[in-house]
Amino acid sequence: MVSSVLEVSHVFCCPNRVRGALSWNTGPGGLLAFGTSCSVVLYDPQKKVVITNLNGHTARVNCLQWIRTEDGSPSNELVSGGSDNRVIHWELENNQVLKSVRLQGHEGPVCAVHAIYQSGPSEGEQHALIASAASDSTVRIWSKKGSEVKYLQTLSFRDGFVLSVCLAILPGTNVPVLACGDDDCRIHLYIQQDDQFQKALSLCGHEDWIRGVEWATFGRDLFLASCSQDCLIRIWRLYMKPASFETKDGSLRLKENTFTIKDGGVRTTVAVTLETVLAGHENWVNAVHWQPSFYKDGVLQQPVRLLSASMDKTMILWAPDEESGVWLEQVRVGEVGGNTLGFYDCQFGENGTMIIAHAFHGALHLWKQSTVNPRQWAPEIVISGHFDGVQDLMWDPEGEFIITTSTDQTTRLFAPWKKKDQKDRSQVTWHEIARPQIHGYNIKCLAMIDRFQFVSGADEKVLRVFSAPRNFVENFSVISRQSLSHMLCDDQDLPEGATVPALGLSNKALFQGDIASQPFEEDELISPAFGSPQVTFQPAVLNEPPTEDHLLQNTLWPEIQKLYGHGYEIVCVACNNSKTLLASACKASQKEHAAIILWSTASWKQVQSLAFHTLTVTQMTFSPDDKFLLAVSRDRTWSLWKRQDATSSEFDPFFSLFAFTNKITSVHSRIIWSCDWSPDNKYFFTGSRDKKVVVWGECKSSHNPMEHPIRPCSSILDVGSSVTAVSVCPVLNPAQRYIVAIGLESGKICIYSWNKTNQEINDWTSCVETNPSQSHSLGIRRLCWKSCSDDDDDDDDDDTEQSEEGPEWLHFASCGEDHTVKIYRVNRRAL
């Protein structure tokens, strides 16, 4: 198959922090669907890769569900609901969107959605019945047949809120039943009669909000599982009541729990009884799910097993005892340690041999059943990522991993996991292998100082410098199959790891002696409540990516320095290519606060303050030869600073203002968000909210800016949307033109090539842009090209091919407000 020009090779993300944003397709090889920001992500847990993104919502995706088939085969339809008040029905083909239909009518965010297939009047005819609940206190019902969607009904709950809905077909009939979990502590049952849902009865018993309801059919009976904030799970049995249950006077037993349905002209009495109450969780139970039916040896199996997830950080697998029929806890799994707050949701997968939980901070926890001991479950590797907008990212200097920062107050490191398959073929997948910083402020920017050292800035006045511990370097070398001696070239005294003291924000370095002297568990139990901070770091030798529990506690990097000098929150930071200088800037509404501070990476002292801009500096970048520092600002101008060669080695080089624009000479009419240099130091590129990208130059340190002013040297490129990120590839295309990646506020990424022409017309050439499934769903925050090296690593051997003119495949990473980090590969020969 011929590869396309632009491909998404790796995606890092996690589910939204809401209940119901997770659904696992039934059948072998079923995909896991979850909502990430405004997108629906389809993830393959077996291959550990994201298959595609479904972009259609304009606000957060709150709930979704695969429409299950009767025979247990994988479904190709799913429904999702979001904070944009919409429900979207997705139809897939080969795991790609074939068509999508928007169902509108709700006047508030959709919080729950469910759908089933219902048989039509003709044999073999089916249509989808969809129910959705929203914060407008209504449940809306739709019917979808083919490409036609028909609105059926609205169920009003006045001042109440329905938090969960579930549809099913009454056994032996074609009558749908709808269960609605309400905030009045009751479950309301509705029966469809003459195409309209009518209330049948309400089930009482729970003492707090109903968080989840789900039906399952076992023979002629229908079972309903419900969970609540009262920490309990209730299982209700719904069955057709024979006429023999009637007493002589015609009254019915359990009258309050019976109702009558009419199907095909025949009236039938249906009874509902409480089967059992399950008490095992110690906090709110947020989700409960029956194990889906599946085929085994050609026979459709429906196991009687129930999975529940709770805010007590545990997930329990329940099943009735074979002898007594009493429901018992079979398996309990969960989180241990860390700053976590329990589980939002859970799902069965792979015929019940895998279970997954969705944690409060977005993390997924996957467990797989042992084939040797069925009662033993082991954690598995699963996708991870930020749960809030990703603000910045950087490749390490050798292009072997990326570090990202986010307003979720974490810094994360993603790297390739290189392993051999059963046929001894090399396989590469990317995973989060470290979480160097878990902070108390939103982290806004970072810069790599060295291969294993970076500086980050957050919504505080301090810059923090981190250095990798020995345990990380050792594990990284094993996971990525790199030479440890190449990484630890000298015998420096590296700390083993780091920990955060109680009520602290600084990662404290831990050395071998600190770990050896830590108390035993018994001593920890009797330690004073306000004594010294407990050591939680435990060094571990890993040969595969770590689990979420390990990431939370054992992958912090020690903080080696704090840099004080700014008066407001840090906005951007940059490091020069020789790794000797840092430049940083903070929020500012006055010139004195908008000054750029230069720091020495040798002494960690301020070298110089560069004052020019009157508002916040949004991005800075050093030229590849380190002779210039470029800054762009919210004041719609840029400034170019030239390094002065020091007359003596005792003095650090300093920068002087070389060129700038003002309100008259500035081409941009709105905030300039981004800038970057061409690899030959001649030109620099600026991108602005005014939808323009401009090339400026030429820049020569020997020129006098008065005699050779730096002006626009390109035609103005209008990309049709606000430009939020610009990045220039370090290599040229085969035609020796500059390759420029442009990130837009719409989430799209466009790649252009540019070359200076005498007429400044036709100098821009559009090469390729991301399609809807490849794009981010919200604004791009940063783009960064990978440095090109001879040992380029990726999934395919083709990626390592080098021609005399350069590599065939180029790689760049992107991050955005949609919580997602993506790595793309581009065919250089096609640009």
Curated annotation (Swiss-Prot):
The keyword Cytoplasm applies. One of its GO terms (cellular component) is elongator holoenzyme complex. It holds the Pfam family WD40. WD repeats lie at residues 56-100, 105-152, 158-200, 205-246, 280-328, 338-377, 385-424, 438-476, 565-609, 612-651, 667-706, 718-762, 775-831. Folds into a two seven-bladed beta-propeller structure which is required for elongator complex assembly. Component of the elongator complex which is required for multiple tRNA modifications, including mcm5U (5-methoxycarbonylmethyl uridine), mcm5s2U (5-methoxycarbonylmethyl-2-thiouridine), and ncm5U (5-carbamoylmethyl uridine). The elongator comple catalyzes the formation of carboxymethyluridine in the wobble base at position 34 in tRNAs. Component of the elongator complex which consists of ELP1, ELP2, ELP3, ELP4, ELP5 and ELP6. Interacts with STAT3 and JAKs. Belongs to the WD repeat ELP2 family. This is Elongator complex protein 2. The gene is Elp2.
